[in-house]
Amino acid sequence: EYIAFKNFASEVVLLDIKEGYAEGKAMDLMQCASLNGFDTKITGTTGDYSKTANSDICVITSGIPRKPGMTREELIGINAGIVKAVASSLIEHSPNTIIIVVSNPMDTMTYLAHKATGLPKNRIIGMGGALDSARFKYRLAEALGAPISDVDGMVSGGHSDKGMVPLTSHATRNSIKVTEFLTAERLDQVKEDTKVGGATLTKLLGTSAWYAPGAAVSGLVQAIACDQQKMFPCSTLLEGEYGLNDLCIGVPVILGKNGIEKIVEINLSDAEKAHMQESAEGVKKTNGLLEL
């Protein structure tokens, strides 16, 4: 929806295993075209990966969603098999594609996509940090009583309730550090509210959120498709960056036509470094449950 409404893609293909579902969604969206002023062609297919052939960018959202009370990690048993099969099928028909992984547990599913496809690290991207950062900025703006457009902030680390690392040392309001406006106690509350952002919505909705995740994905897709060279926090394979190796976890990256153009290493506070290490250990523990 967001990708079509932004009108930067010539074609979008929706694929689902539920008979007729993707076709119906595509038709419903296409009937918005004249009302919303976009020319993107949207089609749907039930399980026919040949319809996705030669895609520049593929987004994997496949798997079961969270239910109230579930952690993202509890989804691994079912979602790992699904993501592995989907990633392999996409690469078969679009060998030069860039893959964005949304399925949970997202960092582990991004790592699995690497292993299943053998693609270079710049072409496998996990979405989580972009969404978590949007939720962080929402909570910061709420605490500051400020417009969200005045606020900037980023979340690194794993895409899990315990693994997120909201970077308060880099959070600003109009380029002024938020520590000038908020007490340490208030900032701690902002961080906690950010970490449980997904769980809060799951409890309210009875399932996973969709508007903000969709907006986050469209931002990543647009940055790649339009070669914007924009910075987002994304899950990517680390090979020594931030002192971490052989795992996918959220860090700042530059996105452009080649996918991840650069991993950006920024200075973290001592507390943030410690939390990042703890987060990495949690991701590696979840990775250990994979049958590679």
Regions found by a protein language model. Give the residues of each.
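Short, well-ordered alpha-helices that flank and scaffold nucleotide-derived cofactor binding pockets
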Residues: E1-F5, M27, Q31, S88, ...
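Conserved S-adenosyl-L-methionine
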Residues: F5-E11, G118-K121
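Conserved N-terminal Rossmann-fold NAD(P) cofactor-binding segment
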Residues: E11, L15-S55, K284-L292
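Conserved N-terminal glycine/acidic-rich loop preference
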Residues: Y21, M27-C32, D56, M109-L112, ...
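Rossmann-like NAD(P)-binding element
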Residues: L35-I98
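Rossmann-like NAD(P)(H) cofactor-binding subdomain of soluble oxidoreductases
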Residues: T71-K137
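C-terminal substrate-binding/catalytic lobe of Rossmann-fold NAD(P)-dependent dehydrogenases
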Residues: T117-R123, D132-L292
